[in-house]
Every structure is written in structure tokens, then in C-alpha cells.
């Protein structure tokens, strides 16, 4: 039995092979928005293909239970297809659904919730349509980008899907506008002072990631330089130039991470400027947000989410609420005024410190 026969035997007789071309129709989506086509009984996952579209697909990987394909030519388009706003959408692994109309995105997300409840929770529950933003651009209040080098210059961007190759960019259409200005300027300064990116293969260089947190309502920003070494070239100069250019910067932090894996943040932080946190507001409360503390990524939509949760919960003054995975206490403090007691549970120590401070600063003692 040759290798091809062995492969077909273990795949239940499937004759599909790598580099084969097939004509197929998309029938569904994966949980992360890849199109699913069926060929000889095997599901094939294809990026940038929508339900009911027909196209020519090249098979690029064949496994026992599924295959992966690349869309070569679209022969029949979906009426829900739209032009992606970002010119790097097809290369970058950051976004999955920019080619799908807002209505179809809403349907996709609603169905994903429905399917998850059915398959994992075994709940036969009717799911209301997801509540969508009017304008889903430039909204994210946190971004972390890897730093690399190309043609002798530093680059920042996002990884291609399933790879360690950086798609260099200066503007991301879902990150806040300040981050789109701050990251390229920081990269320019790091190159000016002679810093080099960390190389995962040789373990040379220093700069791993640049991270920004932004307070949507306060216009406060945190900049974090994640480094392989404790040293950082011309720290004082970097801080001086950054604060001069961006008065919104409330704190600048160096995070030391000597690990060789994919964990982004290290354990040790050095505050180069400011108090080590920023503040933002949510539903009438002010919150302290530290580097490792979780805060909802979409500050406008989270208000809609929390208000809807409060409405559905039908809380009573005698209720006792447990806020599991409470983070910095945003849900806890939003609910506290409606109930007798709220308990927040969280594994990240820095987040609990922020939560206690947030309860105190907002006068919440229950």
C-alpha cells in the first residue's frame, strides 16, 4: 500500500488531495467566520467565502476530519457580500467578517449564540437578534501589536492568520484613532534610539510588542513597551518625546517578558511615567484600569449590554449577586444599586485591586 492509499484509508476513502482544485458551494460558517463547503463528504474550510457562493477552491491542507482550501475564483457571489473597508483584510488575521454586510453579520452572530447554547448547553432557547453598533469602526479601546523588522526598519501590525508573519500597517479600522497615531510614532522613536525587535528564532533583540489602552470617555491613554530585556534605550528621551507629542498619555510602562513562548505579558512591570493606570467612565461610575486588568473592549456597546442585562435580570433589593470573572468590577458596581449585596470573583490579583479601588472611589460598599 503506497502513501496515497494509506492516507485515503485513514480518511475513510476520501480521494481529496493537497493542491487539488474543486468547484464547490458554501453551505455554512465555522465559529470564526470561515466558509464551509462539502466535497466527497468532507468539510472544507475556506476563508473569504460566504453562504450560497460558488467558487473554485484550491485544497491547501487535508486532515483526517476536514480540509482547508483557498478561494481562487468566485463564480457566484452572495447578495450579502460587501467590499471590505480595510485594504489589508485578505492578508491580515485580525478581522474575519468585513466582507459580510452588517445585516448578515448580525445573523451570523445571533446564529453562533443559538448554536452554542444548543450544542454545548443543550438549551433549546430562542435567541433575540444581537444588538449591533450603528458604526462599527474605530471603537476598540485596547490594542497590542507585535514588532518586527523589514528592510532594516521596524514594522508593527498584526499576524497573518495561522502564521508568525506580520502584516505591516499604520492604520487599523477597528482600533481607536489615538492608537493609530501613537503606535507608528512610538515605533519611529524606538528605531531612532536604536532598539531592535525580538527575534523568536535567534532570541536576539528586545522589543516584543507595543500595547495601548485608551479611555473612551476620559481621553486617557496607557502605553506599554513589552521587552525581552530589562534594559530599554534612552528611557527618559522616549518618555519626554511621547508625552510632548501625546498629552493624553497618563502613564507609560515597560513590561519585562523574557519568555520564549507566545505569552505576551511578563510578570514584571516598570512604570516609566504616571501612576501605572488610566481611568474611564461607564454608566455613571469611574474606573481605574491597570495593565493586566480586563476591561470591555467596546466602551459604547458595553453600556448597551449592561443595561440590557439589568433589564432582563429583574433584580430585587433583597437579591445577592455573584459576579464571576468580575475583572475590575464593572458589572458588580453597575448592579450594586439594585441589590442587597454583590460578590465579585476574579483570578487576576491586579484586577481585584482595581475593583476594590473602584468600589471605594464610587462610594459602593455593598
Regions found by a protein language model. Give the residues of each.
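Short edge beta-strands and adjacent turn/loop segments
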Residues: 203-217
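Short, acidic/hydrophobic/Gly-rich beta-strand patch recurrent on exposed beta strands
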Residues: 35-40, 157-160, 224-226, 355
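Terminal RNA-binding accessory module
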Residues: 12-88
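Extended interfacial segments that mediate partner engagement and assembly in macromolecular machines
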Residues: 72-84, 90-197, 217, 232
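Rossmann-like S-adenosyl-L-methionine
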Residues: 3-9, 15-23, 31, 230-366
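Hydrophobic beta-strand signal
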Residues: 56-58, 144, 322
Amino acid at each position: 500500500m503506497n502513501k496515497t492509499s494509506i492516507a485515503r484509508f485513514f480518511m475513510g476513502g476520501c480521494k481529496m488531495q493537497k493542491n487539488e482544485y474543486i468547484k464547490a458551494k458554501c453551505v455554512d460558517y465555522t465559529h470564526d467566520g470561515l466558509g464551509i463547503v462539502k466535497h466527497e463528504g468532507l468539510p472544507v474550510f475556506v476563508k473569504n467565502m460566504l453562504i450560497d457562493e460558488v467558487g473554485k477552491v484550491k485544497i491547501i491542507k487535508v486532515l483526517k476530519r476536514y480540509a482547508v482550501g483557498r478561494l481562487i475564483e468566485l463564480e457566484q457571489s452572495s447578495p450579502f457580500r460587501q467590499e471590505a473597508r480595510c485594504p489589508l483584510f485578505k492578508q491580515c488575521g485580525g478581522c474575519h467578517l468585513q466582507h459580510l454586510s452588517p445585516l448578515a453579520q448580525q445573523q451570523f452572530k445571533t446564529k453562533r449564540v443559538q448554536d452554542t447554547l444548543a450544542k454545548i448547553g443543550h438549551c433549546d432557547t430562542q435567541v433575540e437578534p444581537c444588538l449591533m453598533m450603528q458604526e462599527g469602526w474605530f471603537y476598540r479601546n485596547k490594542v497590542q501589536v507585535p514588532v518586527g523588522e523589514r528592510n532594516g526598519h521596524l514594522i508593527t501590525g498584526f499576524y497573518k492568520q495561522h502564521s508568525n508573519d506580520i502584516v505591516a500597517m499604520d492604520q487599523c479600522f477597528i482600533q481607536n484613532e489615538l492608537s493609530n497615531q501613537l503606535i507608528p510614532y512610538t515605533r519611529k522613536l524606538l528605531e531612532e534610539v536604536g532598539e531592535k525587535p525580538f527575534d523568536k528564532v535567534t532570541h536576539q533583540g528586545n522589543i516584543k510588542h507595543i500595547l495601548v489602552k485608551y479611555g473612551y470617555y476620559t481621553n486617557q491613554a496607557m502605553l506599554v513597551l513589552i521587552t525581552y530585556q530589562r534594559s530599554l534605550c534612552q528611557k527618559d528621551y522616549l518618555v519626554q518625546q511621547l508625552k510632548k507629542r501625546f498629552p493624553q498619555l497618563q502613564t507609560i510602562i515597560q513590561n519585562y517578558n523574557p519568555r520564549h513562548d507566545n505569552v505576551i505579558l511578563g510578570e514584571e512591570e516598570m512604570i516609566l511615567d504616571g501612576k501605572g493606570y488610566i481611568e474611564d467612565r461607564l454608566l455613571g461610575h469611574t474606573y481605574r484600569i491597570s495593565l493586566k486588568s480586563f476591561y470591555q473592549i467596546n466602551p459604547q456597546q458595553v453600556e448597551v449590554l449592561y443595561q440590557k442585562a439589568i433589564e432582563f435580570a429583574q433584580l430585587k433589593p433583597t437579591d445577592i449577586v455573584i459576579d464571576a470573572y468580575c475583572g475590575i468590577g464593572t458589572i458588580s458596581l453597575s448592579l450594586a444599586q439594585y441589590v442587597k449585596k454583590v460578590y465579585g470573583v476574579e483570578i487576576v490579583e491586579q484586577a481585584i485591586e482595581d475593583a476594590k479601588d473602584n468600589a471605594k472611589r464610587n462610594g459602593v460598599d455593598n
